[in-house]
Amino acid sequence: MKGPFRRLALAVPFLLTLTLNVSAETVAETARAWGLIGPWSLDCSVAPDRGEGAVLAYQIASGDRVVHRRNFGATIDESEVIAAKVSGDGMLNLRVFFPKLKQTREYGFAMQPDGTMRALYNRNQKGEYTIRNGKFTANGNPTPSQHKCN
């Protein structure tokens, strides 16, 4: 082999190795690297409640699992993040099992330049969307930014 073909032959196995390593990351590693771990809210100064004060936290649990805790003030629930992958455009795609709802949902977050994140889609396993293209399907309003709380 000569010239560009030789370089290509050397580059392909290297690129395949990189691809395999990326896909071998755990849910916890992916969530941590993307910046998801921690509490998020529309307004971190408001106490948890059903309206503007819901706190959505993503935490690393035993066994290197990621749990999604929703604090609505009067009620708190916990669900397991069963898959996390980052798309080529930087979107974090999650699959979460909600035991109280008895359903698995898939949703995607985009990290904004100011460090907030927005939900770009949210759907059930039947492909029924509550959020599509960054807008609520019920009213067409854009999803709000969520702030990371300390």
Predicted regions and their residues:
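Bacterial N-terminal signal peptides
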Residues: 9-19
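Sec/Tat signal peptide C-region and signal peptidase I cleavage site
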Residues: 20-24
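N-terminal glycine/threonine-rich, aromatic-flanked beta-hairpin/loop signature
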Residues: 46-91, 142-143
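Beta-sheet ligand-binding and adhesion/scaffold domains
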Residues: 26-30, 48, 91-150
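N-terminal secretory signal peptides that target proteins for export/translocation
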Residues: 1-5
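N-terminal helix-cap/turn-to-beta initiation motif at the start of protein domains
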Residues: 25-39
